[in-house]
Amino acid sequence: MSRKIYIYDTTLRDGAQGEGISFSSADKIRIAERLDNFGVHYIEGGWPGSNPKDMEFFTEAAKRKFKSAKVAAFGSTRRANTKCKDDPQIDMLVKANTPVVTLVGKTWSLHVREVIRTTPEENVAMIGDSVRFFKEHGKEVVYDAEHFFDGYKDDPRYALATLQAAQDSGADIVVLCDTNGGTMPGEVSRITAEVVTQMKCAVGIHTHNDSGVGVANALAAIEAGAVQVQGTINGYGERTGNCNMTSVIPCLVLKMGYDCISKENVARLRDLSMFVDDLANVRHDIRQPFVGATAFAHKGGIHVNAIEKVARSYEHIEPETVGNHRRVLVSELSGRSNILMKAHELGMDLSKDTPEVRDILQQLKQLENAGYEYEAADASFHILVQKLLRKHKPFFKPLTYYVTAAGLWHGMTPGLGSSSSSSSSSDENRIEATVDIEVGGQNVHTKEAGDGPVNALDKALRAALLNFYPAIANVQLIDYKVRILDGASGTAAKTRVIIESTDGTDTWGTVGVDANIIEASWEALVDSVEYKLFQDEKRK
């Protein structure tokens, strides 16, 4: 029977300490509930007393019954030369009313002498007293040995003495922390194995990614005998982040065979990763192992030809086992297999014998040479293929468009100082777009104002189509990227625009290229609307 490994998630505390990461108390509750449903064993909610949000979280968490997870409150050992009952921080941990208390204490003599400035003996007493205090209050106690690996390399006898103090006072588990993230996997493996042989209580691991080996260090510690791994979803955390749970969990379950999270739940890993990113308002890392959009994306023609025959020839696991899916990219590097698999992915019926496949491949290479890129523009690729197969049925015909801008001068007039104007502020920087299209046998003319030329064009085009295709009202432009393709040409440089759109259910990308950024944007907008209408027609 495989060894049981416990997942201790600290996204809500250590993860929230990452730059640009902030959760409301409501966000924390939603994430905690999602982690519990996923099967996480421990959820560290925060540091009681450090901020109002954390106490709000603990108050709300106490009202809920979690299925698989125990909620932990995080805090420090008592202050030097202070009794636990007189330490306000200790009191806040009691008031958090959690079944688990996680105490962090000093292990490295450098920190004892130079940071908290007490004696080695008093530090050991601080650890023992604090653990004992919470055990007497009926708590499960996790002891986090801060900077353990640095402390052990500097003075192994003292580092072990701090662990011994926690164990002898009743700690349920001692967790070895690579707080600075500078220890290598070989060192972690050796030191963890040495600690495991000398401790009677369980041993855990907490790593950081400063050297890029946070996940490797966690796995090395598990193989050396640790039974709990601490980390964060998507690797959020101080500096370069903590051990990434979205990498550790599938490694433990799918590759190493540990009893950890059920395979059924691991198949929802990507959804969990995306959910946490959404609440943190962080753009998803497409290159993240296992759960990133490119984790199972194939571009080279040889690769695609191989996976078409045997998927595992270029995939280390089945994408679906972590809730991901295979993607085939089309580019100037594509071969016939790329085109066929991408067409199949987009619901188009192509075979190796389809004579137009060669034409599609040739046209694709020419367009990419001209600056087009279809990796993030599947919808434009779909329309391109339909046109080359002579199956494209346009839903409308663009005729003309105009964009006008009216603004006030707010600069300096030579010899006259700062300029001024009596015009109303509502007229400043006014952008209007006029669109003429042919739709349903009619010529339609619309004019709309917007926050910029692309926004104005988008609004005008949709206004022109709305009476004919009401579903257009649901379409929103959610991302807009511009890239200058030839910076040496200055203002005459060709521009590539990639637009991402959604109707609330599906999301799709389109591309446009032109020396005129507005024309490039218009091309991408037209493709976006065409694709939406095509998909709606197909569903009927």
Located regions from the model:
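A mid-to-C-terminal "edge-of-domain" accessory segment
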Residues: 4-5, 11, 250, 256-440, ...
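Flexible glycine/proline-rich, aromatic-decorated loop/lid segments
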Residues: 213-229, 236-251, 294-318, 494-498
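Generic long, charged, amphipathic alpha-helical segments
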Residues: 469-502, 511, 539
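Mixed-charge, glycine-accented linear interaction segment located at domain edges/termini
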Residues: 506-540
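Small-residue-enriched alpha-helical segments and adjacent helix-cap loops
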Residues: 268, 432, 440-473, 478-485
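Short beta-alpha connecting loops at secondary-structure transitions
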Residues: 176, 231-238, 253-262, 322-329, ...
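Alpha/beta enzyme core
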Residues: 5-7, 13-43, 58-66, 79-203, ...
